[in-house]
Amino acid sequence: MKKYIYPYMAFLLLLAGCSGDFLDKEPTDSVSSDEVGVPGNAERLFNGAWYNLFEYGTTYANIGYRALQCQDDMMADDVVSRPAYGFNSSYQFNDIAIPNNSRTSFAWYLIYKTIDNCNTAIAIDGDSEEFFQAKGQALALRAFCYLHLAQHYQFTYLKDPTAPCVPIYTEPTTSETVPKAKSTVAQVYQRVFDDLNLAQSYLKNYTRKGDGQKFKPNTNVVNGLLARAYLLTGQWEEAAKAAVAARQGYSLMTTTAEYEGFNNVSNK
């Protein structure tokens, strides 16, 4: 009996010793605290910021940025308010006006946590082209977040650019960070433009490597965000130029191809 037990035990010990090699995978969307400042980790920090924006949730009805898009549909009267659909508090604008509403705090945390993650990536010092491309993507995502905040927490730029809007954070925060006061609408949009223009210069040579990277901003995405920001600030000619630049390399899809885009990630 012993001659069978000993080889079996030896096999278990060997399996236990090498299992870590198979299971300890290098994460692609997070880094440990002692690796945050490593330039090579900027891309992983951006990935983590992106995934947080779409995966963080507090309830079944508050999961990622898609929940905020559903909220916007209701606030803009794009859908009918029905009990079975939910988001009735959004229809009443309570989700941006009442501080203790669950979606109010969820939205605030989701966007500012994403900004903070981007700030962590942007704060790293590096000199490689890959590093600056990851930094450019973090800048584009931060601009997207501030663009969202500007549209949700104050009237339009054209109504009053000096109106108080939201706080601007450009550096990583800690538990000891002193909360900042609200910046004006003009200051928030200036932050958006500064980030997007810098992102554009960092991403000028960036090319996505396959369908798995379609979530990563490139110059087309940056120009699309610039077009939106120019529209919101009444700069019509600049908006048109940015929109033309955003669609470079793409043609209008057929109706069939458009429908396929919802089911096929390879569809352009």
Model-derived features: where do they sit?
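Sec-dependent bacterial lipoprotein signal peptides
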Residues: 1-16
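Conserved, well-structured interaction surfaces
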Residues: 83-153, 183, 201-204
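Short coil/linker segments at helix-helix boundaries
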Residues: 152-186, 190
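Structural signature of alpha-solenoid helical repeat junctions
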Residues: 130-134, 141, 188, 211-214, ...
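Hydrophobic-face positions in mid-chain alpha helices that act as interaction patches
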Residues: 44, 57-60, 64, 75, ...
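Membrane-proximal, proline-rich intrinsically disordered regions
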Residues: 18-68
